[in-house]
Every structure is written in C-alpha cells, then in structure tokens.
C-alpha cells in the first residue's frame, strides 16, 4: 500500500519552523530569505534543494518523508541536527513561493 506524504511547502508552516529553529537562526533565516538569499536548484513537491547565502553559500535539502520533514545543510550548525538559518531561509522561501500559498 502506498503511503501519502505531504508536500514540503505544506510541512514548513510557521509553527514548525519556530519550533525547530533557535530564535537567532529564525531571525537570520528570515533576513536571508527577505533579501533574496535563496536560489532553488531543484524544487518539487517532495524534495527541495537550494543554495542559501548567509556568510558563505550553503546547500540545503528539504524532504517530505513518511515521518514528516527531513532536512540537511552543508553548514557546521546543521551537523548538530539543528534547523540552521540556511534551513529556515530555504523553508520560508519554499512556502512563500508555493503556488498554493500565493495570494491573488
């Protein structure tokens, strides 16, 4: 039986991002996203890969898995399993640019 997974854009709501990120990473990630620091490499419903500026350019991958959102970033902060500023920026841009989230 095939299991249904929500899209990455559906998973990265404000509540989840606030819960996963530290206050400083949340602030920095919002600033990076607001200033155009996110460039999508691949953007599909279940997998997003982005290059994110923030000091140095890092690569972020967001995945929709059976247990919810999975993520990785090439920065040192993410290696500690934290939702770093780069992940925040990529998540916010994914949500903001999702066709189902646009306001007409």
Predicted segments — roles?
Residues 1-104:
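Long, low-complexity, compositionally biased intrinsically disordered regions
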């Amino acid at each position: 039986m095939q299991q249904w997974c929500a899209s990455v854009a559906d998973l990265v709501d404000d509540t989840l991002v606030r819960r996963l990120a530290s206050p400083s990473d949340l602030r920095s990630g919002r600033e990076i996203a607001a200033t155009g620091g996110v460039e999508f490499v691949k953007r599909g419903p279940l997998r997003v890969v982005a290059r994110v500026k923030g000091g140095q350019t890092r690569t972020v991958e967001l995945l929709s898995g059976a247990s919810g959102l999975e993520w990785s970033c090439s920065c040192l902060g993410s290696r500690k399993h934290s939702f770093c500023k780069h992940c925040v920026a990529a998540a916010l841009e994914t949500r903001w640019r999702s066709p189902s989230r646009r306001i007409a």
